[in-house]
From Swiss-Prot:
This is Thyroid hormone receptor beta. The keyword Zinc-finger applies. The gene is THRB. It comes from Gallus gallus (Chicken). 3,3',5-triiodo-L-thyronine binds at residues 190, 239. The lineage of its organism: Eukaryota, Metazoa, Chordata, Craniata, Vertebrata. It is found in: Nucleus.
Length: 369
């Protein structure tokens, strides 16, 4: 009989009952499929009392004669050691088959879970990188976790009365703009300090450092403001000290950019990001290899990939309960890049509409091409 033959059988091993080619270990004996089926049916249907030998129980059983005498064939099954207690009735056989199928399905699910569900956490090397980035952020993040206690609300009358009409419907309140410029220099300085605390950034050529900082500065400042969105007062806290409304930020010079930052803040409030996640977002923004004019593009790209991998593994470690947390968080990088691009365009309008003496030198140095 052809078909699957278990590996534990020797080549051409024979059935101990009839001498036909064996197919496996059945009911404690190595037998062919025919004798296995005969033995099972006999026990399940209790047929052996009905068997009768015409030749006084002395028949020789082989693969030719096995179907001629059921009594002698059954006796030989018992003689060679086939176990009647291993034969299951229909209900037990169905239960066993169901159990086998359930176990098989369980193993399939477990293997699938291992394949697609395994979420690696940071390696020792990645933990060291995460530690460096987090410490850099904490050391340069104004007011730290005490920002709510330290913040001061911009007076309501500031930023509500636009006196200069900017192009494209934007409005600039010069008093609000003046207030914002007072905190912009320390805010920019903190972004620079953050970058300079990262060894991989400091190892880059000075020209690349400048390009990266000019490219990411608004993005990182926007992120730091967005994670300090307060839904109760509907304000963002700038540089850890000045709480402003959407209208004040808009009329103070940012125009539609303020809407994007506020919307980002509202969205991020459900993410419950910790300092490490904010720090890694900043590192990813900093090491953007697509900034025009860079020399060490591949080196910067490799560095960003290292941050992204450590970041993803840290997200796995944190076990957020938001569905698709990691891809959703990565989309915020795109949002921040868009904010940076919109601000670059908005900056040109501000330069036209606001007196030059109101712009701090560092502000001009970072945002002018």
């Amino acid at each position: 009989m052809s078909g699957y033959i278990p590996s534990y059988l020797d080549k051409d091993e024979l059935c101990v009952v009839c001498g036909d080619k064996a197919t496996g270990y059945h009911y404690r004996c190595i037998t062919c499929e025919g004798c296995k089926g005969f033995f099972r049916r006999t026990i399940q249907k209790n047929l052996h009392p009905t068997y009768s030998c015409k030749y006084e129980g002395k028949c020789v059983i082989d693969k030719v004669t096995r179907n001629q005498c059921q009594e002698c064939r059954f006796k030989k099954c018992i003689f060679v050691g086939m176990a009647t207690d291993l034969v299951l009735d229909d209900s037990k056989r169905l239960a066993k088959r169901k159990l086998i199928e359930e176990n098989r399905e369980k193993r399939r699910r477990e293997e699938l879970q291992k394949t697609i569900g395994h979420k690696p956490e940071p390696t020792d090397e990645e933990w060291e990188l995460i530690k460096i980035v987090t410490e850099a952020h904490v050391a340069t993040n104004a007011q730290g976790s005490h920002w709510k206690q330290k913040r001061k609300f911009l007076p309501e009358d500031i930023g509500q009365a636009p006196i200069v009409n900017a192009p494209e419907g934007g409005k600039v309140d010069l008093e609000a703009f003046s207030q914002f410029t007072k905190i912009i220099t320390p805010a920019i300085t903190r972004v620079v300090d953050f970058a300079k605390k990262l060894p991989m950034f400091c190892e880059l050529p000075c020209e690349d450092q400048i390009i990266l900082l000019k490219g990411c500065c608004m993005e990182i400042m926007s992120l730091r403001a967005a994670v300090r969105y307060d839904p109760e007062s509907e304000t963002l806290t700038l540089n850890g000290e000045m709480a402003v409304t959407r209208g004040q930020l808009k009329n103070g010079g940012l125009g539609v950019v303020s809407d994007a930052i506020f919307d980002l803040g509202m969205s991020l409030s459900s993410f419950n990001l910790d300092d490490t996640e904010v720090a890694l977002l900043q590192a990813v923004l900093l090491m953007s290899s697509d900034r025009p004019g860079l020399v060490c593009v591949e080196r910067i790209e490799k560095c960003q990939e290292g941050f992204l991998l450590a970041f993803e593994h840290y997200i796995n470690y944190r076990k957020h309960h938001v569905a698709h947390f990691w891809p959703k968080l990565l989309m915020k990088v795109t949002d921040l890049r868009m904010i940076g691009a919109c601000h670059a365009s908005r900056f040109l309008h501000m330069k036209v509409e606001c007196p030059t003496e109101l712009f701090p030198p560092l502000f001009l140095e970072v945002f002018e091409d």
